[in-house]
Structure formats: structure tokens, C-alpha cells
Amino acid sequence: MVNGGHKLVTCTVKNSRSEEAAERLAKAVVGSNLVKAAMFGADANWGRVLCAMGYSKAPFRPEYVSVAFESAAGSVAVCDKGAALDFDEDLAKKVLSENEVTIAVDVNEGEDSATAWGCDLTYDYVKINGDYRT
């Protein structure tokens, strides 16, 4: 069997200005091909998360955003209020290598939250869809 995704990716957005904004932000993160590719590669690239949030057109201030990656292997904070954090790359790799990963985003601007689900983006997915013709 060929799989297009190997892991479940959950994005939780909390402390947003509104539930609608939180939903748009979370959906943009799990829908981003760059985030999906980072999850496949177990790459703790929080810049891709903020980039996807920017594409959402939802209101947020990047300088307030904190990001952590979580799984059964632990949790690693990578960004605090828009600034990079020093973090253990080996731990981040372990956290992101699990089959279920959560991208925890705190926008630090309100009280609303939302969650969205997606998956990673694998070589097989690209191959299948690159070869597919209607």
C-alpha cells in the first residue's frame, strides 16, 4: 500500500482575538505544504508555521506568537513572542518523528482557541499526484 501521509498533524491555536481567527490560523498551518514537508522531515522549522499563519489573512501579531512542537516523545518550545529559542535539536527530531504531532501556537492576544487536523506530505504523495493525469 502506498501512503500519501505518515503522520497526523494537529495545530492548536490559543489566546486568539476570536474563534474565527484561531480557526483560520490553525487551518492555514495544517494546510501549508511547507509545514507538511517540514513535518515529514521532522524539521522544527517554526518560520514555516508563522509564514502559513500570515497566509491565513487572520489578524495576529507575529511578535506575540509562541510556538512549540509536542508528541508522545515530549515537547519542545522553538519560538517565544516572535523570537527564536535555543532548543535541543535531537529532542525536536524525536518529538517530530512520532506518528502524531501537535503544533501548539499561542498568539497571546485574546481568549479564543481552535484546533485543526492535517497530515504530513510524503514523497509518495508527490509521486502519485505528479504522475496522475485526467
Residue map of PLM features:
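Oxyanion-binding "anion nests"
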Residues: 1-21, 25
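Internal helix-turn-beta structural module
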Residues: 15, 23-27, 31-134
